[in-house]
Amino acid sequence: MINPNPKHSDEPVFWGLFGAGGMWSAIIAPVMILLVGILLPLGLFPGDALSYERVLAFAQSFIGRVFLFLMIVLPLWCGLHRMHHAMHDLKIHVPAGKWVFYGLAAILTVVTLIGIVTI
């Protein structure tokens, strides 16, 4: 018999953010680390492609703000979700662990949003 009042879970939302953050961390973050962390300091990047003025102009544009927001927030959600489930797997039960980890991720998301808007 089908339960007429099924219990709804909030877990799909967190798994979605975890998956998006993991994908972003695997595809976009290594490219940014290569470009900004290795090629640029070694002088292997062409000309003024990443000059201060160009990077600032990009960061202040709408698409730049969205990119910076996603670059910070998605890996953050992925990491905190992973920490929450790692603690559970190791049988370390944090009181109200879901509220601690996901609440911290939500607070840091709001802080990031405020920071990105004020650039």
UniProtKB/Swiss-Prot annotation:
One Pfam short name: Fumarate_red_D
Task: Read off the SUPFAM superfamilies from this record.
Answer: Fumarate reductase respiratory complex transmembrane subunits
The way this protein sits in the membrane is described as: Multi-pass membrane protein
Q: GO terms for CC? A: fumarate reductase complex; plasma membrane
Report keywords, A-Z: Cell inner membrane, Cell membrane, Membrane, Transmembrane, Transmembrane helix
Chain ranges passing through the membrane = 26-46, 55-75, 99-119
CDD domains from the xrefs? QFR_TypeD_subunitD (cd00547)
- Asked whether the UniProt record includes rRNA processing among its keywords, one would answer no
For this UniProt entry, the molecular function terms from Gene Ontology, in alphabetical order, are: succinate dehydrogenase activity
In terms of InterPro entries, this protein maps to: Fumarate_red_D, SQR/QFR_C/D
Places the protein is found: Cell inner membrane
Biological process, per Gene Ontology: fumarate metabolic process
Against NCBIfam families, the record matches this protein to: PRK05470.1-1
> Whom does it interact with, and what assembly results?
Part of an enzyme complex containing four subunits: a flavoprotein (FrdA), an iron-sulfur protein (FrdB), and two hydrophobic anchor proteins (FrdC and FrdD).
Functional description taken from the UniProt entry: Two distinct, membrane-bound, FAD-containing enzymes are responsible for the catalysis of fumarate and succinate interconversion; fumarate reductase is used in anaerobic growth, and succinate dehydrogenase is used in aerobic growth. Anchors the catalytic components of the fumarate reductase complex to the cell inner membrane, binds quinones.
| Recorded family membership | Belongs to the FrdD family.
What is the name of this protein?
Fumarate reductase subunit D
